A protein has these predicted regions:
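ATP-binding N-terminal substructure of ATP-dependent carboxylate-amine bond-forming enzymes
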Residues: 1-95, 101, 105-107, 130-136, ...
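Phosphate-binding site of ATP-dependent enzymes
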Residues: 166-249, 270-277
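Active-site "cap" helix and flanking loop/linker of ATP-utilizing ligase/carboxylase catalytic domains
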Residues: 213-264, 293-324
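Conserved metal-phosphate-binding beta-hairpin within the catalytic cores
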Residues: 188, 198-199, 255-290, 298
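Short glycine-enriched, charge-decorated loop/helix-capping segments at active-site entrances
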Residues: 19-24, 158-163, 295-297
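Active-site nucleotide/adenylate-binding loops and adjacent lid/helix of ATP-dependent enzymes
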Residues: 1-5, 61-62, 104-185, 191, ...
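Hydrophobic beta-strand scaffold residues
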Residues: 46, 94-95, 123, 144, ...
Length: 324
């Protein structure tokens, strides 16, 4: 079986003038090489295709693959993560991880909240701020937390994201609207402990494999700077047994409500009463073997990188009914 790899190589974009923040979600070459090596160890023939532009060029040149391992995040628009899966769907080429609808919804944190809340998953009270007029309508209980509605990797989150007054809300909401050209999601702040949970599989076969607790220095928010320099700013701690079942239940319910497939992460945090609430879902979780959250938490529970990739691939192969 021939497996293609699609990805956004960070250096490719940096060479073309994009900033470190613009490319925060993109991959290093060693991530791609590690994936490639893991797939080859499974006996697959592989090809490193590249980003959506390079995929289009390859398809136009007549290239095809039996399966594509897709980790492209995209750069433009609120459907940027959906571009590669949509292209592959048109060519009837199966791929690893979720399709365009799920990726599009999951990138929008407000739409995701609506779906998981309707499925009975606890969420913190919140609202969407799309204009200056919406700021005046906010009647949530302070402190609040604010972030761009459709960014990942902590982009748009900083030490000012925790809000204690209407004046702070106005300042940060106006900054997000101007800086990111998208609405802001405002939620009542969850003061409890924060966890990220790994989920592997699809549908009834999906399992929450385990998680880890995230502690940031001085209790500051988990920003893009902290994620880039997590060894300096953060502590990753194996999830205590007393929180494990509740966190895993929330994560699995979120995954199934959204229709996630093959693998990803779900972030949860405790409210003031200790109840675990949904924060975010990542159906395109980072897969750097050393520095990405899903491989880190997997190692904590005894799942090495090779085994993790094999679990993800088994899910995709079964889901697409492929014959090896």
């Amino acid at each position: 079986m021939k497996v293609g790899l699609t990805y956004d190589l960070r250096s490719w974009y940096l060479d073309r003038g994009y900033s470190m923040e613009d490319t925060a979600e993109f991959d290093k070459q060693d991530t791609v090489n590690s994936l490639d090596n893991a797939l080859r160890k499974m006996g697959f023939e592989t090809e490193q295709i590249g980003n959506c532009f390079q995929l289009i060029d390859s398809l136009s040149a007549g290239k095809r693959w039996d399966l594509v391992f897709n980790i492209v995040e995209g750069l433009y628009g609120d459907g940027r993560e959906s571009v590669v899966p949509a292209i592959l769907d048109q060519y009837q080429i199966p791929y690893v991880f979720s399709g365009p609808v799920i990726l599009g919804i999951s990138l929008n944190k407000y739409l995701t909240r609506l779906i998981v809340s309707a499925a009975g998953v606890p969420v913190s009270p919140g609202m969407l701020i799309s204009s200056g007029q919406d700021i005046q309508k906010c009647n949530l209980q302070y402190p609040l937390f604010i972030k761009p509605v459709s960014e990942g990797t902590g982009k748009g989150i900083n030490e000012k994201s925790l809000l204690n007054s209407p004046a702070e809300l106005k300042e940060m909401a106006e900054w997000i609207l101007a800086r990111f050209n998208q609405p802001a999601l405002v939620e009542e702040y969850l003061p409890g402990r924060e966890f990220t949970v790994g989920v592997i599989g699809s549908g009834d076969d999906a399992i929450a494999i385990g998680g880890m607790e995230i502690e940031c220095r001085d209790n500051l928010p988990y920003s893009v700077e902290f994620k880039e320099n997590y060894r300096e700013f953060c502590k990753y701690i194996p999830m205590a047994k007393e929180f494990s079942e509740e966190c895993k239940t929330v994560a699995l319910n979120v995954w199934k409500a959204l229709g996630g497939v093959d693998g990803g992460r779900v972030d949860v945090k405790a409210d003031r009463d200790g109840r675990m609430c949904f924060m975010e879902v990542n159906p395109l979780a980072g897969l750097h073997p050393i520095d990405s959250d899903l491989p880190i938490l997997s190692r904590m529970i005894g799942i090495d990188y090779q085994t993790l990739i094999e679990m993800i691939m088994r899910s995709a192969i079964k889901r697409h009914k492929l014959v090896l």
